[in-house]
């Protein structure tokens, strides 16, 4: 007891102080038991004792497990191969292949402070996929065609990485992994098996497709042979059956190419056949070919709308070639006459102003006659409606109607169609209202040589004026019917006694006068031998007499 030092029995809590919240803090004057460290030699001794009492597993290298690698190849082909890994992330590299590039990328990823993600690496012939263990989310989904290189890490046993092309940024990226239970060599072997499966599928597609391409450097042209048509399911099953039969042959010498398996088309009586296109529709053409186009169809042409095939362009080209050959095409006459123009031959040797004035006077005359005829039609309807109330005692009105009947007969025999060279002049008239005989206006015609007819527009207007007959009365009466009959019957007798110019608008007054004569025979009958100068015109449009005025002038 005396040999022991005084400090061997110090309390364990000496040197410990409690904080504000009751926690224990270790100060500088802590207990010797907690502050004194063991020497390094003692640590080595303890470690050796622990290792000796533990059963240590023998380390077997991955190269001595070929049976597991064969199982990995079958698992890759069946898309059931998976490894537990830690995904370190990805980093950009500047080369598409090389073990040194992969090792440098893995070194950078291990030194980074990024926490690795535990996941499951699925390897198949389609691609590489990494699924998070906790969230089951897809971390990496890489198609096997975009992977350019893969290799294990020579500095780390469980390291593995591959280089691929990023689809968005088009950069070379290196993805790093650390295998949890397996080595990096096994992961690299599995990815190599995925490369082989992808290559076999591509070669099989090319063989089934049968498309070959050749490039001619002289013409810089590509030549494709074959078709990209995909085989049907029946054809694929037949090919698989043939391949199985060939592999099942025992000896290599007895392998004989047998006939292809006959494919039996299944028959379903309830199936409706799919509609197919006709052979005409499958022909290569510039436009879709329809059946015979009817008259009611909006499609009228059986050809494509090429520039050279248009009817307008074809006619224009044919006309140009015909004109160039010296045989101009004869265009058909138009149904509507064009606007008449004054010919320079018409005014040859004469003053052009006088010729234009003559043409303007003829047009003005026709317009005046047309307006007078329209006004007369309206007044005739009103007169026939009140025919029953006519005052037969008015001698002045009766005599005027009789004179108008005589002038109508003269108009039938002496009226001539106007021409462009005739200038009508109306003489001054002085009607007398006290006597029964009145002086009728006389029209003198200037004899001018007729060279040409009127233009088409003037001919049409003159034809309308000559052929227009008064409209039938709304309420036809006996007086009107008898008047028309008397007018036609008395035309011959009136033509003998009366001669001279006629007024075309006096013919409408004869009907009422003839009817009045038949109903009242006591009325005085005018003499047929009366001079034309002693008669008074019954035309209400030219009395009181005035000089003809030019209403308007048209310069053609």
Swiss-Prot record:
PTM details?
Phosphorylated by aPKC which lowers lipid affinity and promotes dissociation from the cell cortex.
Complex and partners: Interacts with Nak.
**Free-text function comment from the UniProt entry:** Required in determination of cell fate during sensory organ formation in embryos. Restricts developmental potential and promote maturation of intermediary neuronal progenitor (INP) cells probably acting as an antagonist of Notch signaling.
Q: Which UniProt keywords apply?
A: ATP-binding, Cytoplasm, Developmental protein, Nucleotide-binding, Nucleus, Phosphoprotein
Q: What is this protein called?
A: Protein numb
Task: Give residues annotated as binding ATP.
Answer: 22-29
Supply one GO molecular-function term. Answer: ATP binding
Listed GO CC annotations: basal part of cell; cell cortex; cytoplasm; nucleus
Q: One biological-process term from Gene Ontology?
A: enteroendocrine cell differentiation
**InterPro entries, alphabetized:** Numb/numb-like (IPR016698), Numb_domain (IPR010449), PH-like_dom_sf (IPR011993), PTB/PI_dom (IPR006020)
Q: Which Pfam family, an example, fits this chain?
A: NumbF
Q: Identify the stretch(es) annotated as Phospho-regulated basic and hydrophobic (PRBH) motif.
A: 15-86
Give all Phosphothreonine modified positions: 430
């Amino acid at each position: 007891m005396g040999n022991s030092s005084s400090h061997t029995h110090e309390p364990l809590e000496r040197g410990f102080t409690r904080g504000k919240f009751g926690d224990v803090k270790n100060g500088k004057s802590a207990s010797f038991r907690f502050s004194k460290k063991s020497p390094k030699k003692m640590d080595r001794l303890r470690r050796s004792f622990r290792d000796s009492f533990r059963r240590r597993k023998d380390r077997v290298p991955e190269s001595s497990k070929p049976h597991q690698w064969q199982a990995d190849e079958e698992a890759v082909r069946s898309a059931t191969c998976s490894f537990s890994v830690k995904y370190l992330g990805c980093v950009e590299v500047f080369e598409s292949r090389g073990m040194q590039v992969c090792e440098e990328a893995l070194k950078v990823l291990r030194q980074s402070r990024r926490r690795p993600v535990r996941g499951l690496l699925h390897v198949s012939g389609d691609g590489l996929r990494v699924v998070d263990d906790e969230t089951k989310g897809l971390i990496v989904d890489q198609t096997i065609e975009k992977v350019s290189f893969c290799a294990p890490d020579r500095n780390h046993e469980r390291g593995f990485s591959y280089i691929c092309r990023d689809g968005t940024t088009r950069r070379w990226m290196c993805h790093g992994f650390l295998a949890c239970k397996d080595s990096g060599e096994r992961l690299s072997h599995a990815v190599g098996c995925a490369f082989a499966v992808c290559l076999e599928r591509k070669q099989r597609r090319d063989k089934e497709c049968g498309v070959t391409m050749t490039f001619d450097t002289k013409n810089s042209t590509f030549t494709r042979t074959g078709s990209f048509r995909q085989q049907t399911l029946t054809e694929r099953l037949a090919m698989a059956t043939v391949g199985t039969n060939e592999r099942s042959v025992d000896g290599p010498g007895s392998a004989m190419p047998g006939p292809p398996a006959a494919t039996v088309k299944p028959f379903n009586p309830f199936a409706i056949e799919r509609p197919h296109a006709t052979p005409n529709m499958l022909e290569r053409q510039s436009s879709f070919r329809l059946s015979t186009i009817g008259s009611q169809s909006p499609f009228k042409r059986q050809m494509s709308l090429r520039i050279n095939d248009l009817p307008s362009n074809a006619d224009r080209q044919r006309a140009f070639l015909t004109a160039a050959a010296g045989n101009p095409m004869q265009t058909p006459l138009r149904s509507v006459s064009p606007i008449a123009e004054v010919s320079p031959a018409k005014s040859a040797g004469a003053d052009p102003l006088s010729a234009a004035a003559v043409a303007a006077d003829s047009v003005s005359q026709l317009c005046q006659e047309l307006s007078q005829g329209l006004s007369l039609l309206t007044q005739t309807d009103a007169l026939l409606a009140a025919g029953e109330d006519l005052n037969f005692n008015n001698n002045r009105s009766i005599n005027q109607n009789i004179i108008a009947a005589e002038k109508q007969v003269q108009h039938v025999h002496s009226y001539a169609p106007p021409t462009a060279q005739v200038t009508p002049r109306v003489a001054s008239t002085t009607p007398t209202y006290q006597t029964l005989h009145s002086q009728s206006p006389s029209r003198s015609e200037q004899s001018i040589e007729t060279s040409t007819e009127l233009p088409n527009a003037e001919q049409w207007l003159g034809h309308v004026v000559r052929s227009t007959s008064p409209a039938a009365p709304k309420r036809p009466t006996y007086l009107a019917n008898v008047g028309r009959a008397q007018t036609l019957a008395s035309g011959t007798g009136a033509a003998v006694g009366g001669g001279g110019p006629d007024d075309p608008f006096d013919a409408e007054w004869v009907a009422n006068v003839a009817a009045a004569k038949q109903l009242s025979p006591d009325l005085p009958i005018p003499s047929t031998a009366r001079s034309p100068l002693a008669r008074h015109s019954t035309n209400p449009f030219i009395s009181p007499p005035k000089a003809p005025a030019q209403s308007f002038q048209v310069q053609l």
